[in-house]
Amino acid sequence: MHVPGTFYVNDALKGLLFEELQQAVVRGDHGGFLPAVKQLANVAALPGIVKRSIALPDVHSGYGFAIGNVAAFDMDNPEAVVSPGGVGFDINCGVRLLRTNLTEAEVGPVREQLAQALFDHIPVGVGSQGIIPTTAKDMESALELGMDWSLREGYAWAEDKEHCEEYGRMLNADPRYVSSRAKKRGLPQMGTLGAGNHYAEVQVVDEVYDAVAARRMGIDTPGQVVVMIHSGSRGLGHQVATDALVAMERAMARDGIITNDRQLACARINSEEGQAYLKAMSCAANYAWVNRSSMTFLARQAFAKIFKSTPDDLDMHVVYDVSHNIAKVEQHCVDGQHRRLLVHRKGSTRAFPPHHPLIPADYQLIGQPVLVGGTMGTSSYVLTGTEQGFTETFGSTCHGAGRARSRNNSRNKLDYQDVLDNLKAKGIAIRVASPKLVMEEAPESYKDVSEVVDTCHQAGISKKAVKLRPIAVIKG
């Protein structure tokens, strides 16, 4: 290990980490499974890593890097690497939050109709195909321009991109580095939710912890209705990652790079393979922002239909849009010196502090909004970034609850009807394309998101602003 590993966990979450470690001892590394503790140590041994390998409270085993792992690499160190495993297969999987001027009293009586309207408007599920008309030429433009393409084509409002990480566009994107297979997979999926833990939720403001921050974001009234969309780059992002892993295995053999785990395939940042991946990854990130923008357009249409109004009159503005699977070049202070770092965030969210130049003007006094999605039927949170987090975790915090059970375990141990009945008992309308996903994504499959968020708050790496409660959910 070149640097130490640091875990941000409380006693309850620490117990889950040790359970995962114990499972690994019993079953071995069958199927490539490694516990998060070991994965964090393996990342700490990668060339060019600085400061520490960081595990956030929602950490659990992933591919190469654990999900919930943050690691930064010195751009000026010729040995430093970029690893697709540090971003994940769903590049720029992220969350967008829309506010409305509706209340729970207005939406509650029609939540079933609203859930159905969202389900009808937004294509969901494995293999779902979008209804946004997209040609091969459009795809090239979307990969390069990100949300600027959405704005040009009429699927976004001008102010949407102002409230988006990177303003919805990675400038170093170059579609020439995205394979034809990746483009072919992405073309029919524009504006689709996908499956797994992706969702669109209608939520209400449940508690306000920071009135100033909540007011600045326009979500300061308990009972106010908001919409959360969680999705990523679909098959295109998966193919970009797959293509890069193959190329990087060759680069490792050529350059003599040795890692502790084959899943940590990587390349020197400034190598041909490293730069090709970063350009293709940026295209996939742009695709994901276009995807969430397209679903925002569709969600606005669904609300307008149900409430016989316009999205503008319903005040359906974007509060913020964050990525939690990405690698970006950022300026940070390491050992008292300002350094250019390639920060890998996998299952973790950027959380920049007040006055940082890369956050919108209207959030300068409160810090960057951080959107933390809960599980199906549990609360979600809006946090803000802190100066302490910028110093300790490269301006990063948690992204969600984090799995506590494997998908297979959830399918075997949970009953479909029981999960649905529990959601209905909480007054939540649900539409799901695949029944098995109800078990896989049930609250029992995940850690307690409140424990995760509270741990980050108590550690000072982010600050709680608003708690959100679901009243309608659509899933793939």
Swiss-Prot record:
Domain of life assignment: Eukaryota
Binding annotation for Mn(2+) 1: D90, C93, H198
Similarity comment: Belongs to the RtcB family.
Cofactor(s) named in the record: Mn(2+)
Signal peptide region: none
Binding site for GMP: 197-201, 324-325, 373-376, 380, 399-402, 475
Other notes: Ligation probably proceeds through 3 nucleotidyl transfer steps, with 2',3'-cyclic phosphate termini being hydrolyzed to 3'-P termini in a step that precedes 3'-P activation with GMP. In the first nucleotidyl transfer step, RTCB reacts with GTP to form a covalent RTCB-histidine-GMP intermediate with release of PPi; in the second step, the GMP moiety is transferred to the RNA 3'-P; in the third step, the 5'-OH from the opposite RNA strand attacks the activated 3'-P to form a 3',5'-phosphodiester bond and release GMP.
Reactions accelerated catalytically: a 3'-end 3'-phospho-ribonucleotide-RNA + a 5'-end dephospho-ribonucleoside-RNA + GTP = a ribonucleotidyl-ribonucleotide-RNA + GMP + diphosphate; a 3'-end 2',3'-cyclophospho-ribonucleotide-RNA + a 5'-end dephospho-ribonucleoside-RNA + GTP + H2O = a ribonucleotidyl-ribonucleotide-RNA + GMP + diphosphate + H(+)
Protein name as catalogued: RNA-splicing ligase RtcB homolog
Function according to Swiss-Prot or TrEMBL: Catalytic subunit of the tRNA-splicing ligase complex that acts by directly joining spliced tRNA halves to mature-sized tRNAs by incorporating the precursor-derived splice junction phosphate into the mature tRNA as a canonical 3',5'-phosphodiester. May act as an RNA ligase with broad substrate specificity, and may function toward other RNAs.
EC number in record: 6.5.1.8
Entry-linked InterPro entries: RtcB (IPR001233), RtcB-like_sf (IPR036025), RtcB_euk (IPR027513)
Lineage, uppermost ranks: Eukaryota, Viridiplantae, Chlorophyta, core chlorophytes, Chlorophyceae
Cofactor binding: number and manner: Binds 2 manganese ions per subunit.
Record note on quaternary structure: Catalytic component of the tRNA-splicing ligase complex.
Binding site for Mn(2+) 2: C93, H230, H324
GO biological process per UniProt: tRNA splicing, via endonucleolytic cleavage and ligation
Pfam families per record: RtcB (PF01139)
Keywords noted in UniProt: GTP-binding, Ligase, Manganese, Metal-binding, Nucleotide-binding, tRNA processing
Source organism of this protein record: Chlamydomonas reinhardtii (Chlamydomonas smithii)
GO molecular function: GTP binding; metal ion binding; RNA ligase (GTP) activity
Recorded GO CC terms: tRNA-splicing ligase complex
Active site: H399 (gmp-histidine intermediate)
